[in-house]
Amino acid sequence: MLLIFLGAAALARPAALQARVVVDETGRRVNVPDHPQRLVSLAPSITETLYALGLGDRLVGDTDYCDYPPQAKLKPHVGNVLNPSLEKIVALKPDLVLGIAEANRRQTADQLQRLGIPLYGLTDHTLDDTLRSIADLGRALDCNVAATALEQNLRRRVAEVERRVAGEARPKVLFVVWHQPLTTAGPHTFISDVIHRAGGVSISDDLKSEWPGLTLEAALDRDPDVILFPSHVELSPPLDEIKRLPGWREFRAVKQNRLYVVSESIIHPSPRLIDALEQVAAILHPEAFAMAASDEWRVASDEQQAPGFSSRREGFACSSLATRHLSLTATLTGLPPQQIEAAQ
Amino acid sequence: MRVAATRRNVLALVVILSAVCALVGLAALTIGGVHLTLGEVWAVLRGTSSNPEATAIVSEIRWPRVALAALVGASLAVAGTVLQALLRNPLADPYVLGVSSGAALGDILALWVGGRVAAAAPGLAFAGALLTTAWVYALGRRGGRLKSFTLLLAGVVTASFLSAIILFVLTLLSARDVRGAAFWLMGDLSAATGVELRLLAPAVIASIAVLYWFSKDLNVMLLGEDEAAHLGVNVARVETVVFLLSSLLTGLAVSASGAIGYLGLLVPHLGRMLVGSDHRTLLPTAALGGAIVLVLSDTLARTVVAPSELPVGAVTAVAGAPVFIYLLRRTAG
């Protein structure tokens, strides 16, 4: 009898005894332990946020694409964002898994639920969502103080950018998620929000989907003042090459040489999104940032490095681009070439 | 090779293939992203494992997936076998004839409508499969006779038409649903759940049993409709049963795992090489063979590019498309 009791006690996890039910950002009810100690992150942005909150040592697993900060690369990986390995997640014995509705698949959430592993889901459509997610994570992960400090610091930087660009003329911006076929960011994305907050206006804000395709003609017709590319070698060829492409060379922005590569942190809804905001604002309104001591706003950054123009590559694949690629692949698989070949 | 369809032979065949299927299944349960030894897997299967993680991995993640692969494999292979008999065409296959695309369209429409309709997705997939089968069959008949190539072309064109509609519906879905749907369209067994299996297993087994009951009639149908009618086969009834049940099997398979191609072509062909074309031996061979081939394909899909995964449809297409071309050349010759 005693043995059975001891066995049962050994099996029950202490954290599970003190769980509380919270509603996550996606509206799911989640059993979150009071002091989660073993976290698995299913998206690079969440990994970045966890490190920014000083929770890196509680992270026991992340995705293949989690490359920032560099320590994140050393954590055990559970696979890619769209199709993480459930068995690896189980083997890491997490007491809380963190995912993001815009990057992970619903099936993953359902499967984790079935396995009895709590998943806290975030949503990120705007820059404010990203800031709110930091506060939410702070509450869920029992680190309110760090989260509040981080959130306030980021809000201060956002306010500073907004103060500087207030009243300036708003340049029209084309954000190139993918150049061939031209794919851009729709209105309900944090990219569009960053462009807006940085004192610009996205030329694709009237389109419905999140990552809409845009014909080159339509883009030319909308005549952007500035064209932005995220720094990601695989997806955006060198600017020199783009400038020479037929069609592309007709852009006024190309003729005036207003093409810029921005930090790929713009596609991560993490604290580094504010780095991207500052960078985009400085591109769109150089005068507003040149007059003050140019270092001032950079110093405000938490990061050691300035929000640089450094070209890092891997991170992009994790975002919705992978999705885009997937639907393109599905297009191809809809009718396998073998069928046509065979029919002839 | 030809195996006489005595009761003893059929029984022996079923026992041997079931044993192979069990071995392949055990191997599939042992292979995965997390390293588990055969001993650990065996302990979980016997219920004597004291490792909660191993238990969760084997019984909650790997087992549903292996079981789903076996059921889907059996469904598609049997659907292919009976369609080939009925249409007297070795190239008939739910995927090539567009039946899978019809099922996929039905399923994805249900997803688009959402709510209670989404729960009825397998039903809509069945309806889509049935409508496509009837449509392609009608197109393939000219002056009361089935034209082999007209039928195939009708199937291929229908498949591409339906794929276009699917792409259109995909653009209407929310970004989140598109991600799931795009994965599923390529053939995805990873969403296997215990609940689905409990619904799927009886339906698949019952359908295959009913089709087996018609296996003698299917043999006679190979001679041609008129000949079969002369020999006392109720042709209309056989046609109805085959169309309904092959559509049901395809609809269920597609709804559970997306459009996995060429299995209905590859497996019956292998089966005929192994036991001959008597449906009393061919049908059980195709059912168990389909299960074996898809479990193997899915294990390959999970391991060749580990830690990532290939869509299982890619693996079956790589193996199946060359067989299709080989059969096409032989038929055309």
Write out the residue ranges for each language-model feature.
Chain A
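Short, basic, low-complexity termini and linkers enriched in Ser/Thr/Gly/Pro
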Residues: 12-16, 293-328
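His/Asp/Glu-enriched short active-site or ligand-binding loop at hydrolase and phosphoryl-transfer sites
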Residues: 63, 188-211, 231, 260
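Bacterial N-terminal signal peptides
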Residues: 1-10
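A ligand-binding cleft/hinge motif common to bilobed small-molecule-binding domains
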Residues: 103-114, 226-244
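Extracytoplasmic substrate-binding proteins
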Residues: 22, 28-29, 96, 106-183, ...
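Short helices/loops that flank or line small-molecule/ion binding pockets
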Residues: 86-93, 115, 214-223
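Short secondary-structure boundary segments
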Residues: 43, 101-102, 177, 207, ...
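A short, structured surface patch at a secondary-structure boundary
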Residues: 20, 37-103, 108, 203, ...
